[in-house]
Amino acid sequence: AQAAATLAAVLIGHGIIMENGERLLNDDVLNGTVVMILFTCIISSVVTERAARKMVTQENLMEGSEGKEQERILIPVANPETIEGLVGMALMMRHPKQKESLVALSVINDNNTSETKELIGKRNLERTAMIAAAADASVKTVLRYDLNIAQGIIHTQKEYAVTDIVIGLHRKTNLMDSFFGTMTENLLKGTNRQIMIAKLLMPVNTLRRIVVAVPDKAEYEKGFLKWMTQLCRMGKQLGCRVHFFATEDTLKHLRALTEKQEANTFTEFSLLEEWDDLLLLTGHVNYCLLYTSDAADDKA
């Protein structure tokens, strides 16, 4: 608006011809004004972008230093084979001082209820509570009826103020099935909480390295500090190394944050120039796939 007003004033002055035949504002003034406006517009956009990035990173640091958020991790249980792994994952990523931060959920489809399904759901919840108790942690068990599993998880997340959700990776049943499955996709669309999707092929406590592929500019997303802290927390709990792969700019933020807040974590940093190179990391990953999503933004 200021640039437009300045240009309009100069154009008016340029159009005024005095008695001696000269313009009130000559061509040099007009050209200088145009160059000045062009220069300031370019510089201001660059300065604004840099300032916005600094503000975002500073907000992330303040968010982590304040630590006011009460963690509550939701563990939907349906497959008995994955319960132990999901509970172990939740125990590793939770804050050690928050003993009552776990919520286990079993959802029964309201349109297809039966005593058998209710009994299976209760058994899964009982087993979840036993596994958590063995690690000196308490878990609140919830059995609920809903239209579908995704809606049941979303409603429970709202009712219990859940901050994180840990679920197992969908198992494809046919060629037309998507990678994440309908339930997970609906869950990603319906909630703005951090979701960890894990496929564990061996017990969590036997892991010796955590490989993290980070997309470009992930440091400017709201949940960046949170999931980075939780992965480093898992690394400290397991006594294993956390290996980050990211672009050069993102690696700078990761190094700075880990040195400041996670100095006791064993970390490595490697350059990942293009996201298409993600398949090159498969040689580093043998036993675990962990996918993290926060709100509408995805991170691996």
Question: Could you say what each language-model-derived stretch is?
Answer:
Residues 161-162, 285-289:
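Short acidic/histidine-rich motifs immediately flanking catalytic phosphotransfer sites
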Residues 1-75, 81, 120, 167, ...:
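Membrane-interfacial segments at transmembrane helix termini in multi-pass membrane proteins
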Residues 291-300:
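Conserved small/polar residues in nucleotide/adenosyl-binding loops
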Residues 68-281:
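Structured cytosolic domains appended to multi-pass membrane proteins
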Residues 6, 184, 297:
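Short, flexible micro-motifs
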Residues 2, 39, 135, 191, ...:
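Single, functionally critical "micro-switch" positions that shape active/binding sites
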Residues 45-46, 186, 194, 295-296:
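Proline-centered helix-kink/hinge sites
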